[in-house]
Every structure is written in structure tokens, then in C-alpha cells.
A protein has these predicted regions:
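Intrinsically disordered, low-complexity N-terminal segments that are enriched in acidic
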Residues: 21-103
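Bacterial N-terminal signal peptides
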Residues: 7-15
């Protein structure tokens, strides 16, 4: 999987190693099982779906077993909406995609100025409380003499200060993660991004899937951070390596909250009539 190690000399005293890997062909299957009752009249389902992102991933095929009412973009996300009003019992909604996941290789990146619309990645928001005193004070302690060194300092701090406590369906945010000292991948990403923003370094939380895991492990949050020499770079605060990331991420969104899915993760639904149950299964695998 790892074909060569590319060394980028950022300065005479610091080097950043990134692993150049082959593009991976990935099959993605999302299955949503709807368990309904006789009195269920209508269901509205909205989902995040993979999209083409330069130097990150290409979507070659996208197939639905139930025709969607609309596929649209909102705040940079690709969304699909289903309105189901002819319900004759339990059913399964399938979303199938073929993707090419591109190497996390800084040689693919070209430095560019931060744009006005990207300045939102410098401000505090819900779950990313970069304006709170505890976050600001900790960020000041981690500050180094370059953005790259500061980012690595923040990464090291998050790795050492947070204990991975297993999946928690409740979002608590960066501030509570810092105070509690534990969390899942969401809290790791939230704290990393909040500390970067408090250091005046643009950063964002990424939500998506890890390739080749079952649903319990597949959902994942990581981060992207803007480094002037490299542009936007992927950083996974739960990874044991800052420099060498496996080419194993399917990106869905860089919005920490999304009103289109009621600020939930991945999908949201509404129903009319009797209540329903929705069971989710996500499968990703690498194919030749």
C-alpha cells in the first residue's frame, strides 16, 4: 500500500513526510432499512452522499434503488432527498457508488491564498469553541514559530491529552472534550480544529467513512488544516502518525452542522403517521 516516502523539506530543521499511494478504487454501499407500521403515511429522507473533490476523490457511479426526488448541493455538500408516500410495508433504500480515492499526497496540492469564504474556518461555532478562554489559553501554550510546527504541536497535544473512550452518539464539543480528557473521533477532531482556529490557523472538521470497515467502525471524523506551504492538508487526530496517513478516507462533508439533516450526522428523516425505525448499514471495500 505504501509505495514510496516523499520528503518535503519545509525548513532546514523540520521535515514533513507524506506517503504517496496509488489511487484506490472503492465500492460504497449505504443501506437504510425502514421498519414501518400500518399507519405510516409518508417518509422524507435526506442523506449526505459522496461527491467529486479535486485531489481527494472522484465519483464514477452513483445508483439508487429508489428514484430520488432531488439531488442537490447545499453549502458545499452533495445531498439526496427521497419522499416516499406509497408505503406497503418494510423496505430498504440503497445508495451505491464507485469512487476513486486519491492519495493524501502533498505533491498533489498547490499553495493558494485563503479565500473570503474559507475565512469561516477561522471563527468559533457550535462544538468548535475557539473563543473560549480555556481553548485560547491552551492554544497559546502550543504556539510555535511556524504554522506547520504549531499544527504538529496541537496534534501531539490532542493525542496525549484525550483518551479514546469509544463511540458516543452525543456531541459534546471541543471545550468539554478538553475539560473531560476523553472522547471519540468527533471530540478529537473538534478539539484539534478549535485549537487551530484559536491559533489563527484555518481548520475544519471532516465527516465521512474509513474504507474497509463495518458500520460500527466506518463512520469517522478527522480534520483538514490550511498550511501556507501546502494548502489544505488532511490530519487525523486519532491516527498514531501525523506525517503518514493511510489512503483510506471517503469524505462527505466539511460542515460541522447541517440544517438540511437537522444538524444530525450523515442523514435525517421525518415521518407522518405511525413512527418508524431506520437501521443503517455502510459497507466500503477496495476493488482491483
Amino acid at each position: 500500500m505504501k509505495n514510496l516516502i516523499l520528503t518535503l523539506l519545509i525548513s532546514c530543521t523540520f521535515s514533513l513526510y507524506v506517503v504517496a499511494q496509488k489511487t484506490k478504487n472503492v465500492q460504497y454501499l449505504a443501506e437504510y432499512t425502514f421498519n414501518v407500521k400500518p399507519g405510516t403515511k409518508k417518509i422524507n429522507m435526506s442523506c449526505l452522499i459522496p461527491q467529486h473533490i479535486d485531489n481527494i476523490q472522484h465519483v464514477d457511479t452513483l445508483i439508487y434503488n429508489i428514484p430520488p426526488n432531488r439531488v442537490y448541493k447545499q453549502n458545499g455538500d452533495r445531498m439526496v432527498e427521497f419522499v416516499i408516500d406509497s408505503i406497503e410495508g418494510n423496505f430498504v433504500l440503497e445508495i451505491y457508488a464507485n469512487l476513486k480515492v486519491i492519495s493524501n499526497d502533498s505533491s498533489n496540492k498547490k499553495p493558494q491564498a485563503i479565500s473570503k469564504n474559507q475565512s469561516v474556518y477561522l471563527v468559533a461555532e457550535k462544538y468548535l469553541e475557539s473563543d473560549q478562554d480555556a481553548i485560547i489559553q491552551q492554544a497559546a501554550l502550543l504556539k510555535k514559530n511556524s504554522e506547520l510546527k504549531t499544527v504538529q504541536s496541537i496534534y501531539n497535544f490532542v493525542r496525549k491529552s484525550l483518551k479514546y473512550s469509544g463511540y458516543n452518539p452525543k456531541d459534546v464539543g471541543a471545550l468539554q472534550a478538553l475539560e473531560a480528557g476523553h472522547g471519540d473521533c468527533t471530540e478529537f477532531a473538534d478539539l484539534f480544529v478549535a485549537l487551530c482556529r484559536a491559533s489563527d490557523i484555518p481548520a475544519k472538521v471532516i465527516e465521512g467513512y474509513m474504507i474497509g470497515y463495518n458500520v460500527a467502525m466506518s463512520k469517522h471524523n478527522w480534520a483538514e488544516v490550511y498550511i501556507p506551504e501546502l494548502g489544505w492538508r488532511v490530519v487525523d487526530p486519532t491516527s498514531t502518525s501525523f506525517n503518514r496517513l493511510e489512503n483510506a478516507y471517503v469524505k462527505l462533508t466539511s460542515n460541522r452542522t447541517n440544517p438540511a439533516i437537522q444538524n444530525f450526522h450523515y442523514y435525517a428523516y421525518k415521518y407522518w403517521g405511525d413512527p418508524i425505525e431506520v437501521l443503517e448499514s455502510i459497507k466500503t471495500k477496495v476493488v482491483d
